Amino acid sequence: MSSSVRLLLIVALLYTNSWAKTVKETLRITWEEGAPNGQARELIYTNGQFPGPPLIWDEGDDVEVTVWNEMAKNVTVHWHGLDQKDSPWSDGTPGLSQRPIQPGQSFVYKFKASPPGNHWYHSHEKMSLVDGLYGAIHIRPKEDRTGLWSQISQDKEDIKAMEKAARDPEYLVVSDWSQYTSEEYWKMSTDSGLLVFCLDSILVNGKGEVYCPGQEFLQKELAPGLVQDAFPPGTEVSDKGCFPADLDQVQGGPWNITKRPDLIPPRVQEGCVASKHENETIVVDPHRNNGWVSMHIVAAATIAQIAFSVDSHEFWLYEIDGNYVNPKKFVSAVMSAGETFSIMMKLDQEPGRYTMRVPNSGASQVLGAFAEMVYEGHERAEKSGRAYLSYGGNPTSPDVEKNSFFPWQLDTDHMSPWPANKPRPGKADEEHLLVLGRVGAPYKYTMNTKYLYPVDFQNNDPLLFYPDATCGTENDGLVLRTKNGSWVDLILQVSTLPGDTSSFEHFMHKHGSKTWRIGFGTGVWNYTSVEEAIQERPQDFNLETPGLRDTWITAFSIGGEAYWSVFRYYVDNPGPWLFHCHIELHLMGGMGIAILDGVDAWPEHIPEEYRLD
């Protein structure tokens, strides 16, 4: 071999290894007492911290994460937003890709770090997300994104600075929090016959407080029009900002069960007890990266819909669910449970301390929360700046509302992918109508009219290894099957089931692939095909610039009006993927379905280490 050829081979090998290094991580999951909001309870720690540590990789890395379960209960870890191409056994979903990790046991997840962007990891065993197993993931892209940043600024120095800032973001894991564990919380609903969803705090990076501003203040903080449109006249929230637990507008029905609100433990719905604790502080340097800072925000909420703003600071939203979007400038944004946002902010205000506001903006509860953004060197400055959001998540002025991102409003939620990426037009190869709602009780949920997805569905015989296990059984109603290389439309109908005509929003997440939302409208879906609906209601569809995400809000039906959404995706990732609501109470109640994508190209060469006995 000539020296020149040898040199070329060495260079090629070095280049390949620079993008395909093996990264090994270890996560030790423990169950310990903590007090993230100043009030003690038991929770999940990851490597001795809560939330778990951010995991930072480069696009294309071969990742190996060993998870040790040192708790007395089962666990799995799902890598939310990662496509798991050619590694469906590492998705972390019990009953689909693996058996749960038993106490004292370990499991090694192996996958490619893909796609680039900001994602997160979390537990997927029952409702244990409520207990604190979650953390941020950042996959740095191979290529720079000059074309993305040039939409924000044409200045070459700004473009370089934004690229650097995006590769080293601040991480904000925003979660809701209750004084009760997930098992205790679920027991409240089954004992009382009511869906209970009152919280104590919202945390930023595991830090927060319990605020008790008083019932009169909270009543004034209700979203304008909410009580008038959705609840009986005179409805009042409690001193925790919660609606009465037994309201028909909240619980639906009538159901053939006995409602026992007296079995809801004290201090869940009312009886606020304040606790002073520590709020998160993010220190930023206006002299670094030409004054640009990027923030990776994870909505690790289990119930709440999180709003976000920083006093006096505008920001550019440039990434949703790990997918780059054509940037738009806002002063506040609302995130649904399960979503990730990445924002770019110019530190161009008077150096000082500014309040970050992260209230619940949904209709479930009036609940505020705060953190701080501090310009480096001004930690002792007085707080300053204009507030864009109130304690209850309401815009503080009409111009704030005009410049805010609301996922339930299609005119503001028009965040098209960058670079351009649109679905195939015309008729899909497959269509599946899924009817979402409650059946039989306020806390029992379905995605296909009647079947409830059990939390232990196929735990012993995961569908990756036994894809035909449900054939010929009633459980097959919990499974959809698609063919590889096909275009699929998922039609979601909400608020049509008996007793569930005032349905709250659902935050629908699909594992294994992102989907385009190509249509949205009110009423009952009574079309023979999506193609027919497009012809009759072209104003309700967008196949040119639809958003592309893995988590979508279905919207909120006020006054009992039915509505539907259409999501389209391409099947190129064979495997068993869960499609479910990311509100933990809804998933625990049955709102999930298994989609076996590419059954005609099912993974056959499963690594020996993942094969079941």
From Swiss-Prot:
Pathway this chain belongs to: Pigment biosynthesis
Residues noted as binding Cu cation 2 in the record, renumbered to the chain: 80, 122, 582
Keywords: Copper, Glycoprotein, Metal-binding, Oxidoreductase, Repeat, Signal
Superkingdom of this protein's organism: Eukaryota
SUPFAM superfamilies given in the database record: Cupredoxins
Pfam families given in the database record: Cu-oxidase, Cu-oxidase_2, Cu-oxidase_3
Binding positions for Cu cation 3 per the UniProt entry: 124, 511, 580
First-level EC class: oxidoreductase
Subcellular location per the Swiss-Prot or TrEMBL entry: Cell surface
CDD domains: CuRO_1_Abr2_like (cd13850), CuRO_2_Abr2_like (cd13876), CuRO_3_Abr2_like (cd13898)
Cofactor: Cu cation
Binding site for Cu cation 1: 78, 509
Residues with attached carbohydrate: 74, 256, 279, 484, 526
Gene Ontology MF terms: copper ion binding; oxidoreductase activity
Main location: other
Protein EC: 1.10.3.-
PANTHER family xref list: LACCASE-RELATED, MULTI-COPPER OXIDASE
Function: Laccase; part of the Pks1 gene cluster that mediates the biosynthesis of an anthraquinone derivative pigment that contributes to conidial pigmentation that provides protection from UV radiation, heat and cold stress. The polyketide synthase Pks1 produces 1-acetyl-2,4,6,8-tetrahydroxy-9,10-anthraquinone though condensation of acetyl-CoA with malonyl-CoA. The dehydratase EthD and the laccase Mlac1 further convert the anthraquinone derivative into the final conidial pigment.
Family assignment from sequence similarity: Belongs to the multicopper oxidase family.
Name the UniProt record assigns to this protein: Laccase 1
Gene: Mlac1
